Amino acid sequence: KDQAFISKLDGTIALFGAAAKGCVYLNALGSWKLSNTYCVDDTVQKQGKFIPGTEIQVRTRDYLMVDKPDNIIIMAHNFAPTIAQSLINDGYKGRLITMLPEIQIDRA
């Protein structure tokens, strides 16, 4: 269900939050890969590394704001409202998507 939803998204996709629950979720999607996708995390120690078990690199928020993806999937669903508001405050204008516990789409 989640793979089908993500594959139908129009435009570019970035992930936000390289916490353990997001990593487990991405790996649970199986062999399916988000091609040309990156993850953003504000934790400096995670930046420049890859999410375990994937080819998804963790980048900075500055990279995200320059790239301006059409969709941001917020992986840390328990912090989604705070993350969404901070992205809006930073000037993000695309779709904000939370996949867990169920799919929710908001427009920035």
Please describe what each predicted stretch is.
Residues 1-108:
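Hydrophobic, well-ordered beta-alpha structural blocks that scaffold small-molecule cofactor pockets
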